[in-house]
Amino acid sequence: MEKHFDINEEGYSVRCRFFVHDSHKNERHFDHVAIVTHGFGSSKDTAGTAHFAEQLTSKYKDFAVIAFDWPCHGEDARKKLAIPECMTYLTLVTDYAKDTLGAKALYNYSTS
């Protein structure tokens, strides 16, 4: 299962893409969450991101995957790329995984 959502905190709106196995689509807490980050000029909406998420959640059905757009990438509304905002986005996504999804373990998968 896949859905899009935004994390709206601290005046930011982080565009996210969320994946879980269909057998866990009604769950709200996941012990394991993989955060997918992309390279410069890319976005959360690549085929590689979807392929990774589908492969991971089919093998490890209790995992969730979150991909997000960095500032000035994909569907993000920002017009100027600033490293401090990149760090804020990553912190907001990490906090969401821990606080909202209840992640006990976080993983990172990066593509370029």
Predicted regions mapped to residue ranges:
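Polytopic alpha-helical membrane proteins, predominantly small-molecule transporters/carriers
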Residues: 3, 11-12, 18, 50-54, ...
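A generic structural signal for alpha->beta connector loops
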Residues: 13, 62, 103-105
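Short, surface-exposed "cap/lid" segments of acyl-processing enzymes
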Residues: 21-70
